[in-house]
């Protein structure tokens, strides 16, 4: 299905959007044991073509999980498959609420001509992060931030940024993050 620069996708449209309410500490387990396997299955079956997730609070912490459906006739199958895969986490009270919601694309942030490309990057990034999380779950917690920094550096290298450009970009992103989320560095004691 073509979704060029369309802003809003309601449940039943080509983007299916789940909110999985969970704890911050259980999120990785849900991503590794539930989300990743169901995504791999649906991709292998060619039922979905893209997916991505992000962690969010509104104010309750949850995983926002979106899939691009190849054919709307498969929506029932997708809902059933996701439901079956999430049952263990629900029964163990790792997930305490699941919502299917409306996906509103951030066209102002990513651009109407670039949103589909951005979603492809989100999908590739989500798949990469899930693969790494699967490996890191068996490692010391310190590996997590080291791997994150290495991934950021590799991405910067892919864009050919110099050390000065990397530092400038990180500073700009840091300021944007602080403004958007009200982050106060004075609260952190290092």
Residue ranges of model-derived segments:
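Conserved small/polar residues in nucleotide/adenosyl-binding loops
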Residues: 188-190
